[in-house]
């Protein structure tokens, strides 16, 4: 792979939203993570607590019930 293609791939990957996208993201349901009442993301969004790794790159995140930061509120829900 040449350098230009590697750089393009790198920029596309870092521009992906971690956790919640523009219109929300419910995460991925993996059995080992759902047994702990959590879901998998590419990084825990605000208002979620990191528990473990789901596979190699996904993070198992559980919704915080207490002490949620103000950023955890979904701006699209009124």
UniProtKB/Swiss-Prot annotation:
Keyword Secreted appears in the UniProt entry: yes
GO molecular-function term, one example from the UniProt record: lipopolysaccharide binding
Cystine pairs: 33-60, 40-54, 44-61
Keywords attached to this entry: Antibiotic, Antimicrobial, Defensin, Disulfide bond, Fungicide, Secreted, Signal
Superkingdom assignment: Eukaryota
InterPro entries, sorted: DEFB136/42 (IPR035307)
Pfam families cross-referenced by the UniProt entry: DEFB136
Signal peptide coordinates: 1-21
Major location category of this protein: secreted
Known role: Host defense peptide that exhibits antibacterial and antifungal activity. Exhibits antimicrobial activity against E.coli, S.aureus and C.albicans (in vitro). Has high lipopolysaccharide (LPS)-binding affinity, and may thereby be involved in immunoregulation through LPS neutralization.
Family indicated by similarity: Belongs to the beta-defensin family.
PANTHER family xrefs: BETA-DEFENSIN 136, DEFENSIN BETA 136
Protein name per UniProt: Defensin beta 136
């Amino acid at each position: 792979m040449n350098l230009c293609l590697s750089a393009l791939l790198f920029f596309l990957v870092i521009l992906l939203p971690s956790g919640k996208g523009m219109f929300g993201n419910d995460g991925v349901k993996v059995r080992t993570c759902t047994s702990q009442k959590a879901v998998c993301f590419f990084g825990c969004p605000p208002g979620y607590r990191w528990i473990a790794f789901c596979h190699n790159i996904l993070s198992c995140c559980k919704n915080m019930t207490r002490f949620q930061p103000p950023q955890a509120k979904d701006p699209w829900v009124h």
